[in-house]
Swiss-Prot record:
Active-site annotation: H191 (tele-phosphohistidine intermediate), C504 (proton donor)
Domain-level remarks: The N-terminal domain contains the HPr binding site, the central domain the pyrophosphate/phosphate carrier histidine, and the C-terminal domain the pyruvate binding site.
Source organism phylogeny: Bacteria, Bacillati, Bacillota, Bacilli, Bacillales
Any one Pfam family match given in the protein's UniProt record, by short name: PEP-utilizers
Gene Ontology biological-process annotations: phosphoenolpyruvate-dependent sugar phosphotransferase system
Protein name: Phosphoenolpyruvate-protein phosphotransferase
Length: 572
């Protein structure tokens, strides 16, 4: 008899295969065992650290190839944990001073760190706790000589079943054999869920009981469209889901026909669909999905996973590669956005109570021009290889933009004097992420060439709600009328001055938001490359005039719920 288990749909698609239970290894040890050879035990711990670094570096490099640099960046964070003296030194001291065995010392110290970080009302610190837990498990396995599960060794068609998949588990999945996965815990924003979408593997998380309900070798259906897992389906259910899977793949194939199509509404209004990228390694997906440009090139990934700043020459080569590959299509490059949830070990940034509102992005770059100027020089030199736009992140005041522009113009003059060719067709813009910037959009619009609305931060700053906090996640409301009014204000201010506005947050690729944004007059929608074809099909079926009427009604609503109901009634 079949069994239906409900979970959270994390990644689209339908998978049908036998269950492969990811069994947790036995990492038990005698916590009270004391050692006499202290130096030998410290050496055992140090060797486990080095072995973990080797493994994680391989996993990180594989993840960059399969998933792109932005998804691989989590392993840069894991490698930083293994180099953190504030974590490593107390473990070594515990072995030396208390004769603790390496496994016990590691577990005691990392548990303390995890407890402290998890209690903080700061999402970056909570994510760091998860990193420490994952890394600690890997180091412990080397101390004990126990192998961790290795999904990369799977060589038959399976659906993986487990309590949870760590980022390193997910990064090692082979798409040829792993048809999908289902876990007890997790949510749509967990690392494994995000990676499953990049791999385009159907996934269900948060089932609570899948490891109790499924046995090794059971037939499993994962319906990533509805959040259903079926264990040991009946013959009729198998036939029905095989048909559903075929229809899903047929739809994906149909979408591919739109790869080279225009994005134009039924009443003839054009929109631009661009892609977000982290490094040149992301370019194949951009081209395969028919992006009309790059609306966000996150340059911070060039700075991560290394122990020193990238040189001007290294940056120049990366920017040049992207501009040449896009063959004259617009490439919007965001200057370094470090701080907040992104750290660089070699910068020694100060610890802050609230790093998201602190020393980050343009604030850091203006203060540390030895970082900022080489990046601007590299961008200016690369500008002759394509259509380059530059935007500054986290701009709060017009003076910040003016100062950043002045530095850029100064470096442009320096480069010309050095004999370099520089394009005279570079547009300069800003990210609109701060409510104050949106409120003064009319002032900024007189001086910038374009706006790019970063909705991820704009929403949480406007509603004072951390989008990663479960307790206040109900307040993270993309369709709240206050957000729509700010977006409208920014777009109208830019159009009044003959400028354009794009959007590069998650909202830009959201099927509920797209009709509203189209109606508000958004010029460019920048999203993950895998969302582009669906968005193109959606926009090509909408009327701009009708969506304008919809948007005008939406900004007059009182609640997000009213807006969603309005959209659902308009767009059926």
């Amino acid at each position: 008899m079949s069994k239906l288990i409900k979970g959270i749909a994390a990644s689209d698609g339908v998978a049908i295969a036998k269950a492969y239970l990811l069994v947790e290894p036995d990492l038990t040890f005698d916590k009270n065992e004391k050692v006499t050879d202290v130096e030998g035990e410290v050496a055992k711990f140090n060797n486990a650290i080095e072995a973990s670094k080797v493994e994680l570096t391989k996993i990180r490099n594989n993840a960059e190839v399969q998933l792109g640099a932005d998804k691989a960046a989590i392993f840069d964070a894991h490698l930083l944990v293994l180099d953190d003296p504030e974590l490593i030194q107390p473990i070594q001291d515990k072995i030396k001073n208390e004769n603790a065995n390496a496994a016990s010392a590691l577990t005691d110290v990392t548990t303390q760190f995890v407890t402290i970080f998890e209690s903080m009302d700061n999402e970056y610190m909570k994510e760091r706790a998860a990193d420490i837990r994952d890394v600690s498990k890997r180091v412990l396995s080397h101390i004990l000589g126990v192998e961790l599960p290795n999904p990369s060794m799977i060589d038959e068609s399976v659906v993986i079943v487990g309590n949870d998949l760590t980022p390193s588990d997910t990064a090692q999945l082979n798409k040829e054999f792993v048809q999908g996965f289902a876990t007890n815990i997790g949510g749509r924003t967990s690392h494994s869920a995000i990676m499953s979408r990049s791999l385009e593997i159907p996934a269900i998380v948060g089932t609570k009981s899948i490891t109790q309900e499924a046995k090794q070798g059971d037939m499993i259906i994962v319906d990533g469209l509805n959040g259903d897992v079926i264990v040991n389906p009946t013959e009729d259910e198998l036939i029905a889901y095989q048909d559903k899977r075929e229809r899903y793949f047929a739809d994906k194939k149909e979408l591919q026909k739109l790869r080279d199509a225009d994005t134009v509404t039924v009443d003839g209004v054009h929109a631009e669909l661009a892609a977000n990228i982290g490094t040149p390694n992301d370019l194949p997906g951009v081209i395969e999905n028919g992006a009309q440009g790059i609306g966000l090139y996150r340059t911070e990934f060039l700075y991560m996973g290394r122990d020193q700043m990238p040189t001007e020459e290294e940056q120049f080569e990366a920017y040049k590669e992207v501009l040449e590959a896009m063959d004259g299509k617009r490439v919007v490059v965001r200057t370094l956005d470090i701080g907040g949830d992104k750290e660089l070990s070699y910068l020694n940034l100060p610890e802050e109570m609230n790093p998201f509102l602190g020393y980050r992005a343009i604030r850091l770059c203006l203060a540390q021009q030895d970082i900022f100027r080489p990046q601007l020089r590299a961008l200016l030199r690369a500008s002759v290889y394509g259509k380059l736009n530059i935007m500054f992140p986290m701009v709060a005041t017009i003076n910040e933009f003016r100062e950043a522009k002045a530095i850029l113009l100064e470096e442009k003059e320096n480069l010309k004097n050095e004999g370099h060719d520089i394009s005279d067709d570079i547009e300069l813009g800003i990210m609109v992420e701060i409510p104050a910037t949106a409120a003064l959009a009319d002032v900024f619009a007189k001086e910038v060439d374009f706006f790019s609305i970063g909705t991820n931060d704009l929403i949480q700053y406007t509603l004072a709600a951390d989008r990663m906090s479960e307790r206040v996640s109900y307040l993270y409301q993309p369709y709240n009328p206050s957000i729509l009014r700010l977006v409208k204000q920014v777009i109208e201010a830019s159009h009044k001055e003959g400028k354009w506005t794009g959007m590069c947050g998650e909202m830009a690729g959201d099927e509920t938001a797209i009709p509203l944004l189209l109606g508000l007059g958004l010029d460019e929608f920048s999203m993950s490359a895998t969302s582009i074809l669906k968005a193109r099909r959606q926009i090509n079926g909408l009327s701009k005039n009708e969506m304008t009427e919809l948007a005008n009604r939406a900004v007059d609503c009182a609640t997000q719920e009213e807006v969603i109901e309005l959209v659902n009634n308009y767009v059926k």
